[in-house]
Structure formats: structure tokens, C-alpha cells
């Protein structure tokens, strides 16, 4: 990372998988530390659905975007495919556009995951109203609410920081890519 002149403290943040969500501007680059969420596909049949999270770090510099993932994943395969096949004309645009495509993928993940949790909660609440046994529905509802709160804790700090980033006079984000 010496080639990109990434500060030592930023490298520590990248390596700390428990780092809170943040967007931080530096002289030569912008750092975004985010979480992605996905279901545990290796759970036992009798286990409750578990939401796993992984840290993603994006660094936007002059003519480059670096991505760091906590674990190997296919999360950005759609973006890689779009780059290879020039679907969104990403290569002919500035690097801040690539950053916006990556962020759009992460936001899509947030929306679909929240929607899945919401649907599961609705189903459980409906089931709770139609049966009297109670089974373990209360426990499942609590687990889903905890997943929801985990996501909320990671996503809410982004709102304020994202707005601040788009309003800043940062030369790395071009006016055409500010939403």
C-alpha cells in the first residue's frame, strides 16, 4: 500500500474486521468502511436463520479504486462482470463512477437483506396470530429483530457521512457523479 500512500492508521482500520462503519476523507483518497450482510448457508437444519456480516473497505483515489474484503466472496462478481463486458461503460468514466457502482451494489444488498428480514418477521407475526402453541416463534422474532438492529447499527452512520461526502468540495468525486 506504500504505492498508494495509504496511512498506517487506515491500514489498521482495514485489518480490524470489527471497525465501525465510516467514511473518511484524506488528502489523496477517501476511505469507506462498510459491512455487507448475507445468510449463513452452512447452518444446521434446526438452527435459526443467522445473518453473517463481512467488512468491506473501499478506497477512492486519483484514478484508482481499491477494494478490501474480510473474506473471499463473490459479492462483487456482478460489478466485475460489468467491468469485463463494459456493460455500464465503467471503463470510459471516472473512478468515482466505479465507486458509485460498488456502493450501489452494497446498498442493494442492504435493501434486499432488510426486505428478507421484514418478510420473515411478517410471516412469523402472522403465524403467531393463527396458532396458540407459540413454538419458538418468539425466539425467532427476537433473532430477526437482533439481525435488523445489527444492520441498522452499521447503516445509519452512513447516511450522514455520505451526504457530507457528496456535498464536500472533494476533487475525487466529480459533480456529474454526485446524486
Regions found by a protein language model. Name each.
Residues 1-177:
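Peripheral, non-transmembrane regulatory/ligand-interaction domains of membrane transport proteins
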Amino acid at each position: 500500500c506504500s504505492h498508494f500512500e495509504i496511512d498506517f492508521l487506515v491500514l489498521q482500520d482495514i485489518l480490524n474486521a470489527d471497525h465501525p462503519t465510516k467514511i473518511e476523507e484524506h488528502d489523496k483518497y477517501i476511505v469507506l468502511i462498510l459491512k455487507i450482510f448475507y445468510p449463513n448457508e452452512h447452518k444446521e437444519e434446526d438452527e435459526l436463520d443467522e445473518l453473517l456480516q463481512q467488512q468491506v473497505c473501499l478506497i477512492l483515489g486519483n484514478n484508482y479504486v481499491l477494494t478490501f474484503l474480510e473474506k473471499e466472496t463473490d459479492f462483487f462478481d456482478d460489478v466485475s462482470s460489468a467491468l469485463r463486458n463494459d456493460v455500464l461503460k465503467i471503463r470510459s468514466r471516472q473512478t468515482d463512477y466505479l465507486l458509485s457502482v460498488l456502493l450501489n451494489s452494497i446498498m442493494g444488498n442492504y435493501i434486499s437483506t432488510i426486505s428478507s428480514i421484514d418478510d420473515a418477521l411478517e410471516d412469523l407475526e402472522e403465524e403467531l396470530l393463527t396458532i396458540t402453541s407459540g413454538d419458538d416463534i418468539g425466539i425467532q422474532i427476537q433473532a430477526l429483530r437482533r439481525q435488523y438492529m445489527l444492520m441498522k447499527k452499521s447503516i445509519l452512520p452512513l447516511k450522514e457521512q455520505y451526504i457530507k461526502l457528496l456535498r464536500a468540495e472533494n476533487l475525487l468525486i466529480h459533480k456529474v457523479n454526485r446524486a
